[in-house]
Structures are given as structure tokens and as C-alpha cells.
Amino acid sequence: MFVGRDRSGTPRYAHVRGTADPFRQDIAGSDKSYPFHYEGNGNQLFVFEAPIYLLSFICLYPQDWQTRSYLALGGVSGKALDRFLSERKDTRKVFLCLDSDTAGSEACTRLAQDIPGEIAVIRLVPARKDWNDVLRQQGDIPSRKFIAETITLRELPTAQPVPMLRMADVELTSV
């Protein structure tokens, strides 16, 4: 069972996943805007469709994982992402790590449009259908290339240059 909590630690969302078969279910009364997640102290957020994909990704890329934030949407709805970004205004870069299928691609396009403009958005496409498949089949993936494609959906806005004033351009006036 994967549990999502609010800021006070109260459980607000729960998702059950079977270990032997493909059973998955959200518990009745769960609020998807409070997802299973981990908040690091950095300004990067990695977004996944499900908790198992989030954990699989961390297993594949464990170095400094605690410094980043991770969020499982519980599908492809943007409710959880909207809440997270409204509470974590310091987020500067969002990595959309959704499945490598049509639904995942369409959701990335939609979610990217809803992310505030001052945040960079990058799509990481897994080398298999999802990140759990990548983890389970990592030995079959050549050169450990677990990310099939990196797509920049939005760059970070660049600061406007400050005009330079040269001393030769200044007119000296005696007072």
C-alpha cells in the first residue's frame, strides 16, 4: 500500500498494488491531490504515473536521490502536480517521467501546458513501457541507456540582459 499525506502528516490518499498479479486500486475516498511523494530540498521534481514507477526510477538512479522531489500522480491527472507546485514555489525544473505510450505522451503535453511558465519542463521517456519494466529488464538494455529519449518541452526563461553604460557615453556637466 502506498499512502499520500497532507502537510500535517494525515493520510489523504492510498493506493494498493498486488505483487503477484497486475491488481491495482485506489482506496475509496482517496484524494488524488495528496499523492504518494517524497520532498527533497532541491528545486527539481520528477513526476510519475504510479508509486512503483517512482521507486523503480530511484533504484535506477540512486545517487543523491534525497535532494530531489518525486511525485506519483496516481494516473495521468494533474491534480497532484498542481497542488505540489502551489506549495513548493521553489521548483525550477519538472521532469515528466510518464509511460512510453500514447497516454503518457498525451498526458505530458497536457501537463506541460499547465505548469507555470517560469518552470522548465523536460520529458524523460523510459527505454521500456514504464520505469518498472526498465528496472526488471535492465540487464537487457544496452549500455545501461535507461532513458530512451530526453525531450525539452520548455526551457527555463532567460533573464533579460542589463544594458551597460560606458563612461564615454556619460556627458559631464559642471555644477
Language model segments and positions:
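TOPRIM fold recognition
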Residues: 59-175
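Phosphate-handling DNA/RNA-contact segment within nucleic-acid enzymes
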Residues: 1-87
